[in-house]
Amino acid sequence: MGRGAIVQASWLAFLAILLAAGAVPAATDFPNKPVNLVIGFAAGGETDIVVRAMNEELGKRLGVPAVVLNKPGSGGLVGAEFVAKSKPDGYNLLVLSLSHVLRQAGDPTMTVNVPKDFEPICRFVTQPIVLVVQGDSQFKTVENLIDFGKQNVNKLNFGSPGVGSVGHFSGELFKAETKATFKHVPFNGSAPSITALMGGHIDFLVTALPALGGKVASGDLRILASFADKRLSEMKDVPTMIEKGFPQARMAGWFGFVAPAGTPKDVLEKLGQAFQGTIKDPKIVETVQKMAFNEAYLSAGELSTHIKSELALFSKIAKEEGIVIK
């Protein structure tokens, strides 16, 4: 082949590469179609409600609709698997929660690896976690409860919505930090565990505040402490576990957004900017507060660190307490 033919062939190859590249939408065009916010739980649940409170505003900031897509099943895993296997282009995002991290901590066979299979975008809200007893419980302070638990091995029971739930791990964290002993009684959901507490069948719960509804205001239940960093604005008379001398007894339910691993950096940045603006919008802040959530934005990097820290902590607790989620 002559020199001219070689040059011509090289140019043809170069043009073919350019044409092929042009067939793929550039990341700078993002977004040019609706973005799906995938929830691994059924419509009408707390995750669904809080995400729907912000998807319209998010769509305005993205310039395309933000569509809530419910894919319930296997405790949120169906939705997580769907997003993990989606094309990493930013159009399918998972609403990730503490529940996904706890599932991985207690289930070594889990089909999704949270740190490896997803790119963090942001955390957007948290839920306060509180320790609650029956309204007429003999335990008037959290110190009373801890002291009794230390002096009477496994005489007290704490309930939860089920093995591996936020309530279960919260209770185990309480045990680990206070060095008191309590027996775990799992139920099939939050409502049965709260009913059991009100009926005196268990001694306490460690649970997300929204699950209690109006039962604290009615006097049926009484909160002894919160696991927040500081006193809750809506319950300034309730002390934190930190105040009581347990600085590591900190925990909150949380929700964030993640994309499939391999999503382009510029797409993640555009999503991050839109989410941050949405979450910080005063109307959205007010709306989520009325739902007993708190605006609690974390950037992608901060969320990544948070996930790894919580996964390490709760994997340790799962191993020590023999928690196996099936």
Where are these regions (language model features)?
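N-terminal secretory signal peptides that target proteins for export/translocation
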Residues: 1-7
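Bacterial N-terminal signal peptides
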Residues: 9-22
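N-terminal (or domain-start) structured segment
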Residues: 26-117, 155, 163, 179-206, ...
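An extracytoplasmic/periplasmic, membrane-proximal ligand-sensing/linker region
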Residues: 32-34, 176-180, 243, 265-326
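Hinge/capping helix and adjacent helix->loop/strand transition within the periplasmic-binding protein
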Residues: 58, 85-92, 105-192, 241-243, ...
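Beta->alpha turn/N-cap motifs
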Residues: 95-100, 160, 189-190, 207-212, ...
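A ligand-binding cleft/hinge motif common to bilobed small-molecule-binding domains
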Residues: 99-109, 173-177, 204-238
